[in-house]
Amino acid sequence: MKKFDSHTYLYIAAAGIVLILALVVIYMLTPVSKADVTQYVYIDDDDTQDSVIAKVGAIGHTAGMTGLTTLIRHSNYGERIRTGRYAIEPNEGAFVVFRHLKQGRQTSMMLTIPEVRTMDRLAGVLGRKLMLDSATIATALYDQEACQKLGYDTCTIAALFVPNSYDIYWNISLDKLLLRMQREHDRFWKGDREQKAAQMQLTPNEVCTLASIIDEETANNAEKPMIAGMYLNRLHEPMPLQADPTIKFALKQFELKRIYNKLLDVNSPYNTYRNEGLPPGPIKIASIKGIDAVLNYVRHDYLYMCAKEDFSGTHNFARTYQEHLKNAARYSKALNERNIK
């Protein structure tokens, strides 16, 4: 039987070490993701090391996942799992991905604030986009004390939100989110907008309230300054705004196509047929176009408007009630002809 000398054993051992190191390098450097585009993994506050492995594994390459699984299981990663939205690039190996997860090197995201009608709807959107629970968000937005800390009440809180897109972290806390929105609101209004509102003797909240009504009246941005001028004329008369969108909001029946006289008696501070002045707060998150339409309103002497009978989304304006009745009759006739109830 052939005997191996000590040098042979050293060669075998060295070869074994080289093989092991080669495997380590392969497993650590082989891309984790099997996709050829950036993938995102969302680590929640109830995740464990096993669930993290499962989440990454859903988009992972077998060899790359072997290395990542080894690193996660044989380290103290499970003792402090960092929440967040993590980008996994196509060429990133197990060691790089593990380091990002371990150190909490998450990737920010663009959050767009939608122009929704209710805070329930906003909470739902934010709950789907962020780590936050929608019920928790809604509770805060309907809590008087929480709103007052930000300088609002439950009627005006919609004015806090400027419908822009913001670079934000997926795992942001609710308090930090609201404070961020407050900073963005102040930045949006500071300067020219704030000065114009003051010259009009309106607060930013009041501008947002009127803008929200105008947004609901038309999607035609070019016409919004005209509508703003008409409503401002009514406020200065003073006359009730008589804005149909406020009736829909009061009834929470946003799908209504026609506002009949029987609906005008709804007992609500948002009923601008029964109450003079602006309603208590915005009836939706006002658009930037709507806000700027109020601040740059067209000066004219119109007091009435009615949707055009051609259903173009624009309006006929009138100076007198008699002229307005003629416009309203034409529009009502067009509705009847189309059997719109």
Label the predicted regions.
Residues 27, 31-189:
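Signal peptide-directed extracytoplasmic domains
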Residues 1-39:
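N-terminal type II signal-anchor transmembrane helix
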Residues 112, 124, 131-135, 146-341:
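Bacterial extracytoplasmic/cell-wall-associated proteins, especially those involved in peptidoglycan
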Residues 12-13, 81, 148, 310:
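Generic detector of intrinsically disordered, low-complexity, polar/charged segments
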Residues 14, 41-44, 89, 199, ...:
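Pocket-edge positions in alpha/beta enzyme catalytic cores
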